């Protein structure tokens, strides 16, 4: 059976993000079991080195990956998808028979190593979003894609 992971850099999300994530995670679990793996972020202080933080977090992400994953990296330079396109991608990903992994980076983004192993890059658009909020948006969009594929009334379309 395909394993689906959401690997997100960051811990201690605001309560409202955790509650929203839990709700959509519960709804999605009937169609696609998803496991959240939280990666410890690098320390950010007065002498913060952004590149070092990206590399440290990247190593932790790489260590959390299952064998031979199909990695979809959330990246501002990725391909933007509308809800129907995401549903089509979900159908494709499910048919691959590989472990599916969604990767959410920290405040500075992903290491080059993480970007290099990505099979696809998905952009939520040109907006700058708090990385903690992205996990909620992703799980809601995955749920929406599932409802499109199952003709559930949650997604009313155009």
From Swiss-Prot:
GO terms for molecular function: rRNA (pseudouridine-N3-)-methyltransferase activity. The keyword Magnesium does not apply. S-adenosyl-L-methionine binds at residues 74, 105, 124-129. GO terms for cellular component: cytoplasm. Keywords: Cytoplasm, Methyltransferase, rRNA processing, S-adenosyl-L-methionine, Transferase. Specifically methylates the pseudouridine at position 1915 (m3Psi1915) in 23S rRNA. Belongs to the RNA methyltransferase RlmH family. Its EC number is 2.1.1.177. PANTHER family: METHYLTRANSFERASE, RIBOSOMAL RNA LARGE SUBUNIT METHYLTRANSFERASE H. Coiled coil: none annotated. This is Ribosomal RNA large subunit methyltransferase H. The lineage of its organism: Bacteria, Pseudomonadati, Pseudomonadota, Gammaproteobacteria, Lysobacterales. Pfam families: SPOUT_MTase. HAMAP family: 23SrRNA_methyltr_H (MF_00658). Homodimer. It catalyses: pseudouridine(1915) in 23S rRNA + S-adenosyl-L-methionine = N(3)-methylpseudouridine(1915) in 23S rRNA + S-adenosyl-L-homocysteine + H(+). Gene3D superfamilies: 3.40.1280.10. It comes from the Bacteria. It is found in: Cytoplasm.
């Amino acid at each position: 059976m395909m394993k689906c992971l959401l690997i997100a850099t960051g811990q201690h999300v605001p309560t409202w993000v955790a509650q929203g994530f839990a709700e959509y995670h519960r709804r999605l679990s009937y169609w696609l079991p998803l496991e959240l793996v939280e990666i410890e972020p690098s320390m950010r202080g007065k002498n913060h080195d952004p590149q070092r933080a990206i590399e440290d977090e990247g190593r932790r992400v790489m260590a959390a990956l299952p064998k031979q994953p199909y990695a979809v990296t959330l990246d501002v330079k990725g391909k933007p998808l509308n809800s129907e396109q995401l549903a089509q991608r979900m159908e494709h990903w499910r048919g691959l028979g590989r472990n599916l992994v969604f990767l959410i980076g920290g405040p500075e983004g992903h290491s080059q190593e993480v970007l290099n192993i990505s099979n696809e890059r998905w952009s939520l658009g040109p907006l700058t979003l708090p990385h903690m909020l992205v996990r909620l948006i992703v799980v809601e969009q995955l749920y929406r894609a599932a409802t499109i594929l199952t003709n559930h009334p949650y997604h009313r379309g155009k």
